[in-house]
From Swiss-Prot:
GO terms for molecular function: ATP binding; glutamine synthetase activity; metal ion binding. This is Glutamine synthetase. Residues 107-468 form the GS catalytic domain. NCBIfam families: GlnA. Signal peptide: none annotated. The modification O-AMP-tyrosine is found at Y397. One of its GO terms (cellular component) is membrane. It catalyses: L-glutamate + NH4(+) + ATP = L-glutamine + ADP + phosphate + H(+).
Length: 468
């Protein structure tokens, strides 16, 4: 990328770009957009921005103070491969007109403040993330006064092994927890994932790997390579956009953590490391080849994990994944290579690649907020020398109950995570990265989600209680 405003204007002219799509991210992490004709974009657009109504975005402005500005980032310019008309995407900061500064509740502005705070420490941040997702052939749901229900289906799902198809049932299906990772024809989505990866590469991402994941019914993972803080979050948005749109040709993709009952859920494993003066300061001669700084970083994440869960696992559905027996990282421990721990130290060939993998996040997270929160927790651990105690090299899933009781766990529900965030958020406020205004708006949005589920009768309640 590396575009300047003049580069973007030149690109619009050279490529005869018809439309510019201004994109920004709301509190929940969903991208929003507004399009303008390409010919109206001038260099001044990148300093003056475009006005919009902020009162329509949940958790933001009231109608009495709704004017806001979208300020496009020229360095984010990328052609959209899915639009019929030639369209250039520009991701935007949301600006407060009264101050000319990034809006306190704008997730992208939060991420930029985190980057500024990180630079003030003289440290750099890199990461690799691997989101998991499902691709279904169909999905339906219904919620009204007469009842509620949902239904997902995928031809490759284990439950379709006895289904009659017009062209015949060819078998070759994945069993429950059997998706990791046989070759085609059992893996029926090799070409689909390849098409996704090619589109991601076209949009500037560096794809590291793709494969079928553990669950039946079309669970997959695509890993995207290391990069610095703000571009990483932008790449996460591109990845989700590509997955949704490539799948939408004939199917439907979801990043919900637990759309299928009885099989593994989908996470977003985030690999992180810190560097200073060109050196990886996570590399050392302590446990797992880590430095003392890396251990303190882990200690900060473990200490603040339940509050961080409110941002890394911000949906009620997140906690249907974070339960025992489905390879979910529910215990706050760290270990070299051990995937049952919530923080893993992967094997690497060189100390330059030394990193940690935080395994509890999922892709309902707003990446601008989630990655910033993990960073702030880790930096707090370094600043306060929070040691994470002894590493756990045992299979944590097989520990007796009395041993498990001595290991802290992630939040068990969104409600618990929000309570933790209410009580433990000072580490987020350092350097003005997050603010009390942001916290108020975020909690309003998320408590409303908790309340929606709380007052909605669930079908399984009929199974448990109808005949009592």
């Amino acid at each position: 990328m590396g575009y300047s405003p003049s580069d973007v204007v030149k690109l619009i002219q050279e490529k005869d770009i018809k439309f510019i799509d201004f994109r920004f991210t709301d509190t929940k992490g969903k991208e929003q957009h507004v399009s303008v004709p390409g010919h109206v974009i001038e260099e001044d657009t990148f300093t003056e921005g475009k006005a919009f109504d902020g009162s329509s975005i949940a958790g933001w402005k009231g109608i009495n103070e709704s004017d806001m500005i979208l300020l496009p980032d020229p360095d984010s310019a990328v052609l959209d491969p899915f639009m019929d008309e030639t369209t250039l995407l520009l991701r935007c900061d949301v600006i407060e007109p009264a101050t000319g500064q990034g809006y306190e509740r704008d997730p992208r502005s939060v991420a930029k403040r985190a980057e500024i705070y990180l630079k003030s420490t003289g440290i750099a941040d890199t990461s690799f993330f691997g989101p998991e997702f499902f691709v279904f052939d169909s999905v339906t749901w219904n919620i009204d006064m007469s009842g509620c229900a949902y239904k997902v289906d995928a031809e490759e799902a284990a439950w379709n092994s006895g289904k009659e198809y017009e062209s015949g049932n060819m078998g070759h299906r994945l069993g429950v927890k059997g998706g990791y990772f046989p070759v085609p024809p059992v893996d029926s989505a090799q070409d689909l994932r390849s098409a996704m990866c090619l589109a991601m590469e076209e949009m500037g991402l560096k794809v590291e790997v793709h494969h079928h994941e553990v669950a039946t019914a079309g669970q997959h993972e695509i890993g995207v390579g290391f990069n610095t803080l703000t571009p990483r979050r932008m790449r996460c948005k591109i990845l989700k956009y590509v997955v949704h749109n490539v799948a939408a040709v004939r199917q439907t993709a979801t990043f919900m953590p637990k759309p299928v009952v009885g099989d593994n859920g989908s996470g977003m494993h985030v690999h992180q490391s810190l560097g200073k003066d060109g050196k990886n300061i996570f590399a050392g001669d302590l446990y797992g080849g880590l430095s003392e700084i890396a251990l303190y970083y882990i200690g900060g994440i473990i200490k603040h994990a339940k509050a961080v869960n409110a941002l890394t696992n911000p949906s009620t559905n997140s906690y249907k994944r974070l339960v025992p027996h489905f390879e979910a990282p529910v215990l706050l421990a760290y270990s070299a290579k051990n995937r049952s721990a919530s923080i893993r130290i992967p094997y690497v060939n060189s100390p330059k690649a030394r990193r940690i993998e935080v395994r509890f996040p999922d892709s309902t997270a707003n990446p601008y907020l989630a990655f910033s929160a993990m960073l702030m927790a880790g930096l707090d651990g370094i600043q306060n020398k929070i040691h994470p105690a002894t590493a756990m090299d045992k299979n944590l899933y097989d520990l007796p109950a009395e041993e498990q009781a001595n290991i802290p766990g992630v939040a068990a529900s969104l409600e618990e995570a929000l309570r933790a965030l209410e009580a433990d958020h000072d580490f987020l406020m350092k350097g003005g990265v997050f603010s009390e205004s942001w916290l108020e708006g975020y909690l309003d949005v998320k408590w409303a989600e908790v309340q929606t589920l709380r007052v909605t009768t669930h079908p399984v309640e009929f199974q448990m209680y109808y005949s009592l």
